[in-house]
Amino acid sequence: MPGGRRGPSRQQLSRSALPSLQTLVGGGCGNGTGLRNRNGSAIGLPVPPITALITPGPVRHCQIPDLPVDGSLLFEFLFFIYLLVALFIQYINIYKTVWWYPYNHPASCTSLNFHLIDYHLAAFITVMLARRLVWALISEATKAGASSMIHYMVLISARLVLLTLCGWVLCWTLVNLFRSHSVLNLLFLGYPFGVYVPLCCFHQDSRAHLLLTDFPYAVQHQAVEESASTVGGLARSKDFLSLLLESLKEQFNNATPIPTHSCPLSPDLIRNEVECLKADFNHRIKEVLFNSLFSAYYVAFLPLCFVKSTQYYDMRWSCEHLIMVWINAFVMLTTQLLPSKYCDLLHKSAAHLGKWQKLEHGSYSNAPQHIWSENTIWPQGVLVRHSRCLYRAVGPYNVAVPSDVSHARFYFLFHRPLRLLNLLILIEGSVVFYQLYSLLRSEKWNHTLSMALILFCNYYVLFKLLRDRIVLGRAYSYPLNSYELKAN
């Protein structure tokens, strides 16, 4: 009727009175969102949070077989043999002769100039390279235990004799080197220890790698927080000498325990576990870097520092040998300190952590957005705001801090369980192919001998890497519901 009151149209009812599905899924009083009408005023309807509407699925982990890993004593013995072979090859590269020439030419009758070799330096290098093997022998003997008093006295006597012998050889070689060389050359003998002090002594957060996973939820949460605060307090209160002694003790201690994973339910526990694993991983990488550089320094670089100025040698080939020794030592130590079980542990923790992708301003303006909460487990595809930036959840299970770069880096490195193993295979395979190419093109006898000897050592390392890659590749490629799953 003209002049009568008109009711709201169907289009107005659909716009103002009914909440949209996006608002129901993305809204929440705690997240700072709510229902709004056409004019922009808020409607006081309670909206459930996103965790009540969308529950992330459980994180499922693959079961991997227990691959054989070399024991501490066996690995140190093989590593020591490899370093001795590399040291022998470097001495061949430096002191080789042309022994096949006729006698009417000024040549040597031996393959090496043995009279130019400093045997005190060779003995010093051998003892320094054997330090881990000696400590592994002492550790294994200590773990065996003593069944009687006589057995205990024999173990103590053997340890004292072994350590005394090593110390006497070091002192004897240092005294003779001090008599025949300048002080500048002697400084090269202890240079790696000067690098180790700032590299490892002032980073005591690695003590947090002992994860407390055998306790209930409340006890575990309290224990992790107390251990983190205790670690920080100890690192601040200890003096330089204590830090140095602890770092040197860890340098000789080969048996580093592998942490465990407990599939925690709380976001705080997940982040604390990631922090502990991150500190433990950084500690292991530092040990790998230092020991590989230490080995390459004493095997391939230190003999060059004590060569006489009148001695000619192939500088390019010696430097190439130095690089090869460092790469091979790095791969061998990484394989031992980061085994497949440890990489699977990091992968499981990264699956619980998740990742956030930073988006540009203005994008997804019509999509529901939430305020990030540290006590919420966010599902995949959710948009949150944190520190005035917009982020999107990438993983199916996300508890990471969006602005924390270390969390994103941890997820990138370990969310694929075979990434580290593939990288090691790529490095070692490239070295093997390059050495085969150099072996085919080599014309000098010392080049052929050095490549042939080093290749035998590299074949063993490459075989172990390829074996682990094939077995783990098949284990991770199986569908998750084809065997027993572990879900939190």
Curated annotation (Swiss-Prot):
Pfam families: Tmp39 (PF10271). Regulates autophagy by controlling the spatial distribution and levels of the intracellular phosphatidylinositol 4-phosphate (PtdIns(4)P) pools. Modulates (PtdIns(4)P) levels by regulating the ER-to-Golgi trafficking of the phosphatidylinositide phosphatase SACM1L. GO terms for biological process: autophagy; negative regulation of autophagosome assembly; negative regulation of autophagosome maturation. It is found in: Endoplasmic reticulum membrane. Its main location: endoplasmic reticulum. One of its GO terms (cellular component) is endoplasmic reticulum membrane. Glycans are attached at residues 31, 39. Interacts with SACM1L, SEC23A and SEC24A. Belongs to the TMEM39 family. It is a multi-pass membrane protein. The chain crosses the membrane at residues 72-92, 110-130, 154-174, 182-202, 287-307, 319-339, 420-440, 446-466. It comes from Bos taurus (Bovine). This is Transmembrane protein 39A. Keywords: Autophagy, Endoplasmic reticulum, Glycoprotein, Membrane, Transmembrane, Transmembrane helix.
